[in-house]
Amino acid sequence: MLKKTPHIILMSLLSSSLLLTACKKADEPAKTEQHQTNSSTDQVMEKLNERPVKKFATTADDAHDIALLEDYDRRFTEMSDEMETELEKMHEAGTLTTEFEQKRTLDNVRSALTMLKDLDLKTEQGRYIQGLLYQYWENQEKHINDKQANKDEQVNQLADYLQAQNQLKYWKASQQH
């Protein structure tokens, strides 16, 4: 299940991609610019959707791990939403600084990593999803600290996050049969 935070990340990535493409092609005719922008967006979407869901054997611990991963997702989403609300209020009040926003974002990422580490998952599929999510957030922490992120790297890392979400959704649906 995709929540608000992944949508924001995806929209930011797509917007950045479109903005960069538009800036690079500003001196070309409008028709060519639109074709390039659409092509770039299509490439990003293809990259995000290219990995199929992996098949795992059903185990007695599947429901346990699904519940833990969904609980992690719910708690992390609530925490992220609260942070976004706090930052929006500070922005509206004119008290938000770039440094504070970056610090809170880094705190949020580190919280995701800690929450993921604390999950006691018992299945191979659960640990696979946990690993994808952990890798995604670890890379986000690196990019926040480095302040440099290659667009292709961002797409690959977002693909990891979305793969984890799709895997969990598929896994949960397969348990209901």
Q: Residue ranges of each PLM-predicted region?
A:
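Bacterial N-terminal signal peptides that target proteins for export
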Residues: 2-10
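Hydrophobic alpha-helical segments, especially transmembrane helices
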Residues: 4-5, 25, 141
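Bacterial N-terminal signal peptides
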Residues: 11-17
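C-terminal motif of bacterial Sec signal peptides marking the signal peptidase cleavage site
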Residues: 19-22
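Immediate post-signal-peptide N-terminus of mature secreted/exported proteins
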Residues: 26-100, 173-177
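Intrinsically disordered, low-complexity regions enriched in Ser/Pro/Gly/Gln/His and often acidic
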Residues: 65, 69, 129-130, 164
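Long, amphipathic, charge-rich alpha-helical segments that form helical bundles/coiled-coils
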Residues: 101-161
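Short, low-complexity, Pro/Ser/Thr/Gly-rich segments in the mature regions of secreted, periplasmic
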Residues: 161-177
